[in-house]
A protein has these predicted regions:
Chain A
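Short beta-strand->alpha-helix linker/helix-N-cap micro-motif
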Residues: 25-89, 100
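Amphipathic beta-strand/beta-sheet edge segments enriched in Tyr/Trp
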Residues: 24, 83-148
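Short loop/turn segments that connect beta-strands within beta-propeller blades
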Residues: 121, 181-185, 225-229, 269-273, ...
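A flexible loop/linker signature enriched in serine peptidases of the S9 family
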Residues: 157, 168-176, 194, 212-221, ...
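Blade-level signature of beta-propeller repeat domains, shared across WD40, Kelch, NHL, RCC1
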Residues: 396-427
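Hydrophobic beta-strand positions that form the internal "hydrophobic ladder"
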Residues: 164, 206-209, 250-254, 294-298, ...
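Residue-level detector of Asp-centered blade-edge/turn motifs that repeat once per structural unit
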Residues: 158-160, 204-205, 248-249, 292-293, ...
Length: 427, 160, 265
């Protein structure tokens, strides 16, 4: 019998060997940075003015990020308001990959918004939510929808509900420090002065804003409580006081003092007490920026001949050079995970916003200039907010996506808008 | 024992005196001219061909005092050295190109650079204050050589 | 016995399947009908008869005969038609093979019944003689099956020769078309900057559309990137596929290996 079994197995194996066939494999290398086509349909019952319709708020938010492209939804009959109303073949023909549909119920005391995010290819629901708020919170609800859609698709929390600060210069020698929504709505002044204000910095705990004012005929540093409006003069030492930078725990400020010498970096408590010199050099050291892990500080220095960015370890005081391309690199700021740095670099005589991967040291220019300045990352590190000066005539602020592909201005008026800062996620 | 305590106390006092904690309040650069204008020779300040020139100009991103301005700086340095009551402020500026903070530092470096030249000619630090306004007073609309005049140090005297 | 070498060359699934079934059925046939070792070689069995046994129906011979006839017929056909259009007739050959397989399965059933009949026979000599006869028939069958296998192979080889220059080139061409179409739709914005890779398996309809959702076989570890690449596959529908069914058969299931940020130099 064993003879039979052996032969049997042998034959089966041979036969199977000739039968076994791998399926064809195709290698697909590379891709390009594109935008996901999303249909953000008008919500049923949304009687708002065009600009403040929920779907318009969400469309503008998602398009600002650079990850999404909104499909035109004007002139469509029978707008679906629920996932079960969706005609998938229609939206596939329009090349939509995702869709948002929703309903609004509004009365005098509250507004309720129910919405669905739908995968058009797989014809299934990705997420559905209901938001309730008072009627004045309409825009915030819109931003929350954008945030959740963003998070579901990219895996990163959205920042569309966050706030920004910026300095506005009027013609008659009047300067204000304003706070507004990321998209420029709901702007209000928190400081008004006849002298310049620069270097605005929102604290990581969201409660305060530090800034440099020239109201004492020289630069001095204030810290202002955003909820009470109370301000405290925390640095008025001999010479200049400028470039305040919050530690990640909001308890300390790095700053720059001069004392009849070149600009040098110091560290003190956020209330102005216990000031210590960080390092000593015969050069310009300025623009400190804390690493998010609190272990080191990035700064600008001309110790190498021209302005470049360096890093000092707070423990052993070891200094490393960070930027090596070009002759002018200033204004370092870090992503919350510490992996990327944004800064201003000079290329071809133009000042551009750049981003550097701190592990690979690869540098990407995000803007074209000619006079861009003051870059700061979004709290999720996906966008950079900065100032554009157009031939000195006007200056305005806007955001650019981290890959440099999508720039969107922030409309806050026609005056000179500069020196922006970004709130954290919670404030 | 007592001697030791006294010694320790003396040493402590010495160190306290050498502490690097800066003084908290700073007077605004334009202080009142206290003890009168004696010995300040204001006519000289207002008439001398060199002393009436109050601005030193710099090349883009540079802070060294150029040869053509050495005479002016020296003249002011001599004036300060000759008039111990004189108090001068050197206010540095930069054009609008580049970051506000770096321009503040650049303006400062320029005013310090002028001060250093003055020190060589005998003007003492106690009579000179250096500050910077960076690009904050610069012409934001300037093109090309129009921006040259924003890169400067202005010399002013408290008495004026 | 039968040549093992014959089993090694195979051209397509049907012929392989046919081969496998032939052999399995043969094995089963042999297992069930032939006593590989005599049960009691040293003891003779004696049957006590009360009367002279009548001749039992020798049905077991018939099936083999039929098979023989069948094979001979097709063998003739094949030999005749090779010089003509081997292509079209490959289809006929395959169809006939299918019929053969079906017939074989029917035979297997019959073999079961024969086995039961067998057990009734107690006469050893008779069984021996039957076995001997069976062996001879089996060998004959195998010989003719060998010949048939050979001629089948010739037919299929001719088939292959005709398409040879065209077939593998065509396959590569369609693979390249599919690769190009999908690659231009890959949006790597959500895939970071590292050299990651991910694999999807897809099943296609002859129209080039997906039969079902792509199946993620290996994740990039970044779900947003996996989803973005899956969308690229959907956007690329319908994929360019050949109309020729044999060629399409090779492409209807594919494994797609993606490297959204390329590969290091």
């Amino acid at each position: 019998m064993t003879q039979l079994i052996k032969t049997l197995i042998f034959i089966i194996l041979i036969s199977l060997h000739s039968l076994a066939k791998a399926i064809e494999v195709i290698d697909i290398l590379g891709g390009k940075a594109g935008e996901i086509a999303i249909a953000v349909l008008p919500f049923e019952g949304d009687g708002s003015e065009k600009d403040i319709k929920f779907n318009e708020i969400v469309k503008a938010d998602l398009e600002r990020s650079g990850f999404f492209r909104a499909i035109k939804t004007d002139g469509i009959n029978n707008i679906p308001k629920d996932i079960k109303d969706i005609d998938y073949s229609y939206w596939t023909a329009l090349k939509a990959e995702l869709a948002i549909v929703g309903k609004v119920e509004k009365n005098d005391t509250q507004v309720k918004v129910t919405w669905d995010l739908v995968d058009i290819f797989k014809q299934k629901l990705i997420t559905t939510m209901e938001y309730v708020g008072n009627p004045s919170q309409g825009r915030l609800i819109g931003h929350r929808i954008s945030n959740l859609v963003y998070e579901k698709v990219t895996g990163t929390p959205g920042v569309f509900h966050t706030k920004i600060g910026y300095v506005k210069k009027f013609d008659d020698k009047k300067y204000t420090l304003n706070i507004s929504d990321l998209d420029g709505f709901n702007a209000k002044a928190v400081v008004t002065s006849t002298q310049p204000i620069i270097s605005t910095r929102w604290s990581p705990d969201g409660k305060k804003i530090a800034y440099v004012s020239f109201e004492k005929k020289k630069p001095v540093i204030f810290v202002q409580d955003l909820s009470t409006g109370e301000r405290k003069l925390v640095a008025n030492f001999k010479g200049n006081n400028s470039a305040p930078a919050w530690s990640p725990d909001s308890k300390q400020l790095a700053l720059v003092l001069t004392y009849n010498e070149f600009s040098q970096i110091y560290v003190m408590n956020a209330d102005g007490s216990d000031i210590k010199r960080l390092m000593r050099s015969r050069y310009i050291d300025t623009e400190p920026a804390w690493a998010p892990d609190g272990q080191s500080i990035y700064f600008t220095s001309d110790r190498g001949g021209g302005p470049q960015i360096y890093n000092i370890n707070l423990d052993d005081k070891e200094i490393k050079r960070i930027t090596f391309e070009g002759k002018y690199n200033v204004s370092p700021r870090l992503t919350p995970d510490g992996k990327f740095m944004t800064f201003i670099t000079q290329e071809g005589g133009k000042l551009k916003v750049a981003a550097q991967n701190l592990k690979s040291n690869q540098v990407l220019k995000l803007t074209k200039g000619p006079n861009d300045e003051s870059p700061v990352f979004a709290p999720n590190g996906h966008m950079v907010l900065f100032t554009l000066k157009n031939s000195g005539n006007t200056s305005k602020i806007g955001t650019v996506s981290l890959n440099g592909f999508k720039f969107v201005p922030i409309e806050v008026g026609a005056n000179l808008i500069q020196e922006p800062t970004w709130s954290p996620f919670d404030f | 024992m007592k001697k030791k305590i006294l010694l320790t106390a003396l040493v402590a006092l010495l160190f306290a005196g050498c502490s690097s904690t800066p003084i908290n309040d700073a007077p605004a650069p334009s202080a009142a001219a206290g003890s009168g204008n004696e010995g300040l020779d204001l006519d000289l300040l207002r008439s001398d061909s060199l002393l009436t020139q109050r601005s030193i100009y710099f090349d883009f991103n540079k802070y060294e005092v150029k040869a053509e301005y050495q005479d002016i700086v020296n003249a002011h340095a001599k004036y300060i050295a000759d008039h111990p009551n004189a108090k001068a402020t050197l206010k540095g500026h930069a054009d609008y190109h580049g970051s506000h903070e770096y321009n503040l530092a650049l303006g400062q470096k320029r005013s310090v650079s002028v001060k250093d030249v003055m020190n060589l000619k005998g003007a003492s630090d106690s009579q000179i204050e250096t500050v910077s306004f960076g690009e904050e007073e610069a012409n934001q609309n300037c093109q090309g050589s129009q921006c040259d005049k924003d890169r400067r140090v202005d010399i002013s005297y408290d008495v004026e | 016995m039968f040549r093992i070498a014959d089993l090694e060359s195979s051209i397509d699934t049907q012929s392989n399947l046919f081969t496998l079934i032939i052999h399995l059925s043969l094995i089963l046939f042999m297992a069930f009908t032939i006593q590989w070792k005599p049960k009691n070689p040293y003891f003779a069995e004696v049957e006590l008869w009360e009367a002279i046994p009548t001749k039992t129906a020798e049905n077991q011979m018939t099936p083999i005969k039929e098979l023989d006839v069948e094979k001979q017929v097709t063998k003739k056909e094949i030999v005749k038609e090779i010089p003509k259009q081997a292509d079209v007739d490959a289809e006929i050959i395959l169809k006939k093979k299918k019929e053969k397989i079906k017939k074989l399965q029917e035979e297997l059933l019959k073999q079961e019944q024969i086995k039961q009949l067998q057990e009734r026979l107690l006469n050893e000599e008779k069984s021996k003689r039957i076995e001997k006869e069976k062996l001879e028939k089996l060998q004959e069958m195998l010989r003719s099956e060998e010949v048939n296998q050979k001629s089948d192979r010739i037919a299929i080889q001719a088939d292959k020769d005709v398409e040879a220059g065209v077939n593998s080139g065509e396959l590569d061409k369609y693979k390249a078309l599919i690769q190009q179409k999908i690659q231009q739709n890959v949006n790597n914005n959500l895939c970071g900057t590292d050299y990651i890779s991910l694999d999807f398996e897809i099943k296609l309809l002859p129209s080039g559309e997906l039969l079902s959702d792509p199946v993620l076989k290996k994740s990039s570890k970044n779900p947003s990137c996996d989803e973005a690449v899956e969308r690229a596959i959907f956007i690329s529908e319908p994929l360019p596929v050949p109309t020729d069914p044999k060629l399409f058969a090779k492409l209807k299931q594919l494994r797609l290996k993606f490297y959204p940020n390329g590969q290091p130099e």
